[in-house]
Amino acid sequence: MANIKSAKKRIKVTETKTLKNRMIKSALKTTIKKFEAAIEAKNNEEAKALFTSVVKSLDMAATKGVVHKNMAARKKSRLAAKLNSMA
């Protein structure tokens, strides 16, 4: 356990940020799973609508530093390819 006041504060801040990052990652994974389920079900309209929300979530996570920007770009590219192959 930390003895120094600033170290105690850093522990609190780290816990708060970890929870927030975990929440953002979890929501991102959920939207991606919904998108992939729509692709599997061959539901073109729903997949297109979900794709925009996935891209928005990925961009937000990359902007906030939760995921790396290259990872977000790679995911967007691969998911767009899945969407285009379905059409």
From Swiss-Prot:
It comes from Clostridium beijerinckii (strain ATCC 51743 / NCIMB 8052) (Clostridium acetobutylicum). Pfam families: Ribosomal_S20p. Disulfide bonds: none annotated. SUPFAM superfamilies: Ribosomal protein S20 (SSF46992). Transmembrane segments: none annotated. InterPro entries: Ribosomal_bS20, Ribosomal_bS20_sf. Keywords: Ribonucleoprotein, Ribosomal protein, RNA-binding, rRNA-binding. NCBIfam families: S20. GO terms for molecular function: small ribosomal subunit rRNA binding; structural constituent of ribosome. It comes from the Bacteria. Belongs to the bacterial ribosomal protein bS20 family. GO terms for biological process: translation. Binds directly to 16S ribosomal RNA. GO terms for cellular component: cytosol; small ribosomal subunit. This is Small ribosomal subunit protein bS20.
